[in-house]
Each structure stands twice: as structure tokens, then as C-alpha cells.
Amino acid sequence: TGYDAKKIPSFALQSEPRKKGELASNWTLMPEFFLNDGKAGASLAVPEGTSLYGGGEVTGTLLRNGKTIKLWNTDSGAYGVDGGKRLYQSHPWIMGVRKDGTSFGILFDTTWKAELSSMDDKIELRSEGELFRVFIIDRESPQAVVKGLSELIGTMPMIPRWAMGYQQCRFSYSPDSRVLEIADNFRERRIPC
């Protein structure tokens, strides 16, 4: 059995991609798919010296080589769950930057709980769910890969002008008169509250 887009629609794609041409004969980023007890996975060999980034919000360095990330996010106050390795955003996405600066992005099109491992020689996603698709974007730079990703999944709408650069912490206000003072200040500045 294989992947069926009608049975398992994508939550990531803006629209179904269309074929743009033939695959280059020297193409090296070939995913290998596997099933273990009904749980799907995929792995891809990566060129030596490739720097890997992605996977979502976790503590540690941006460079993900040699790391395994659990893709099952949580609201982790004080980074207490799994030592900050499962924070607010989980992304089944890895970007690789080769030694020559050319880059690729890999989107594992699944929302199942998963582990994303980015070893020096391969990238592997092991999900707890059914078969999924893998999309590979291979371009001349990291910027071009991100542009390709936005063409595939879409972009976010522009935030309201008042929100540009604005951060309002709501962790603790005491006493209640302070909350009312802040709300009055918001209204004076025409910021929704």
C-alpha cells in the first residue's frame, strides 16, 4: 500500500504541487520510506559537511547536526518538559546548507507525533502514524529554499501595523488597579485589549 492524498490530505500545503519537469539524472536527495508495525518513516542521505537546521522550537544551538528532536510540542513553562526539547512549535522540516552554499529543504508532510534525527550522514523522520509524502526543495541558497517553502505552504498575512515590534507580557499583574491602568493605556494608543 502507498500514500493516498484523498485519504490523508496535507495540512501543510497551500495547494497540491504540479510537476515542473523531469528529475535530474544526478539527483542525490532520494528518500527511502519504511514501515515498522504500521508506523511510517523516511530517511535521506545528505552530503558530507552539510549543516542542518530546523525541526521547530527547542533549546540549544540552531545547528541540528547530531540531534534528535521530538515533534510533539507542549507549553513547557520554565522549559521543564524533556529539558526544553519540546517547546511551542514542532516542524517536520529540515534545511541543509552544503559546503558550497547551495541548499535544500525537506518537508515531511505529516502531523503525527514523530522524531526527527539529523545525523551527519542522513536525516530521518520516524512517525507514529501512517505513510506520508516528502517534499524536497533544492536551490542555490538558503534564501531561495525558504522562498520555495513559502511557495509550497503559503505565507502568513501581514500583522497589524500596531503590532510591529510590539510585545506585551501578561505573566502577572498585581494589583488589579495595574491591569486597569494598562488597559486604559492600550485604549489611549488604540491598541486592542
What does each model-found stretch correspond to?
Residues 1-163, 170-172, 176, 183-188:
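Catalytic and substrate-binding clefts that recognize carbohydrates or anionic sugar/phosphate headgroups
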Residues 192:
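Primarily the dimerization/phosphotransfer
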